[in-house]
Amino acid sequence: MRHYEVVVLIHPDQSEQVPAMVERYTSTVKADGGQVHRFEDWGRRQLAYSINKVHKAHYVLLNVECSDAALEELTTNFRYNDAVLRSLVIREDAAITEESFILKAEKEGRERKARPARAERRDDTEAEDLSDEEGVEAEDFEEEQGV
């Protein structure tokens, strides 16, 4: 059996049915003795260009190990399902189980959005502390000069 990476773009109006569709595709793979190594639901994303006047799609990533017959059945299911806008199947040398770059970038983006608010608050308090210290230094200088 070979390893494959499968990306499926599903019509955004069918987003509620994505779990059932994924279950159907994974059962197709497992029925032939295959295995699903990784499943990622990337959610609804903007397309680079419109497909059939649709500007968004629901993205799903699967890394599977299956036979050629199971892969053929899977691609046939994609082809005849009207909800599937596009599908891409790439043959891999080994099973990939780690997080994809898109999921990692999405998590880092969420973390970055949370961090600046805290950092800005720290910068504001540091600026206030510095201005207080400068005022104290100015008073000390004036006292030394006898003003």
UniProtKB/Swiss-Prot annotation:
This is Small ribosomal subunit protein bS6. The gene is rpsF. PROSITE patterns: RIBOSOMAL_S6 (PS01048). It comes from Cellvibrio japonicus (strain Ueda107). Binds together with bS18 to 16S ribosomal RNA. The keyword Ribosomal protein applies. Coiled coil: none annotated. InterPro entries: Ribosomal_bS6, Ribosomal_bS6_CS, Ribosomal_bS6_sf, Ribosomal_S6_plastid/chlpt, Transl_elong_EF1B/ribsomal_bS6. Belongs to the bacterial ribosomal protein bS6 family. SUPFAM superfamilies: Ribosomal protein S6. One of its GO terms (cellular component) is cytosolic small ribosomal subunit. CDD domains: bS6. Keywords: Ribonucleoprotein, Ribosomal protein, RNA-binding, rRNA-binding. It comes from the Bacteria. GO terms for biological process: translation. Residues 107-147 are annotated as: Disordered. The keyword Ribosomal protein applies. One of its GO terms (molecular function) is small ribosomal subunit rRNA binding. Residues 125-147 have a biased composition (Acidic residues).
